[in-house]
């Protein structure tokens, strides 16, 4: 159960997990932008799978912070 209530914006209700998803997406973009110039993607076998796993890990960490 999250600490945040359901938020209503212009008649649309958003569950608290929606904002956790957006926050983890923003952090994912920042981390990916930092990792691209380092050349780490040259060692990654499947970049799309790596990006998905990275996003899932970030979402897990963010969601653990708000529980």
From Swiss-Prot:
Keywords: Cell membrane, Membrane, Transmembrane, Transmembrane helix
Primary localisation category: membrane
Topology class, membrane: Multi-pass membrane protein
Residue ranges of the TM segments: 3-23, 43-63
A Pfam entry, by short name: DUF1656
Cellular component per GO, a single term: plasma membrane
Protein's UniProt keywords contain Membrane: yes
Annotated compartments: Cell membrane
Expression induction or repression: Positively coregulated with aaeA and aaeB by AaeR.
InterPro entries tied to this protein: DUF1656
UniProt family annotation: Belongs to the AaeX family.
Designated name of the protein: Protein AaeX
Organism annotation: Escherichia coli O1:K1 / APEC
